[in-house]
Swiss-Prot record:
This is GTP-binding nuclear protein Ran. Gene3D superfamilies: P-loop containing nucleotide triphosphate hydrolases. Belongs to the small GTPase superfamily. Ran family. It comes from Carassius auratus. GO terms for molecular function: GTP binding; GTPase activity; magnesium ion binding. Monomer. Interacts with RANGAP1, which promotes RAN-mediated GTP hydrolysis. Interacts with KPNB1. Interaction with KPNB1 inhibits RANGAP1-mediated stimulation of GTPase activity. Interacts with RCC1 which promotes the exchange of RAN-bound GDP by GTP. Interaction with KPNB1 inhibits RCC1-mediated exchange of RAN-bound GDP by GTP. Interacts (GTP-bound form) with TNPO1; the interaction is direct. Interacts (GTP-bound form) with TNPO3; the interaction is direct. Interacts with KPNB1 and with TNPO1; both inhibit RAN GTPase activity.
Amino acid sequence: MAENEPQVQFKLVLVGDGGTGKTTFVKRHLTGEFEKKYVATLGVEVHPLVFHTNRGPIKYNVWDTAGQEKFGGLRDGYYIQAQCAIIMFDVTSRVTYKNVPNWHRDLVRVCENIPIVLCGNKVDIKDRKVKAKSIVFHRKKNLQYYDISAKSNYNFEKPFLWLARKLIGDPNLEFVEMSALAPPEIAMDPSLAAQYEHDLKVASETALPDEDDDL
């Protein structure tokens, strides 16, 4: 173990349909990208993402599927011993949100009670198809939800901070310095971000629809 290696480490699995931006998202963290390792037996890349908190550094070993989810589900070996997860969909593609319950089912079948964040990526694109009011799956399953835009770094740290607070058991945990991120490839429109934050707040205060399906 390297001298300044964080003592606190967690396996984080990143799941969701192919093309939703999972790899783009994890590659934003520059040291994680520089130090990633390829696990040939499972066909995954593991990115070590370190975050500095007021309780000391923590490391997420983020398992990224390297695109194999396009050929069907992932093997159990991918999920085994995961301590937390991010499920990602693309807000410009309804089918990727429709598949979220399948990813969640596979995940909790192997990892029963781990903290999970649902992320809707690509919110920088104006032509949004999956609106805040339609995103209800996380409320039914007690997950956390964030709009994100990997290419603009918008809300990049939010899923990791929420998971850290759950895993460490400290709701007041904070990140004390921001990780080095790749420069934004695009700018997130501040007025659009404000509108989406408002829409999510309104949606969170609206009663869930009665139907019992997962969409």
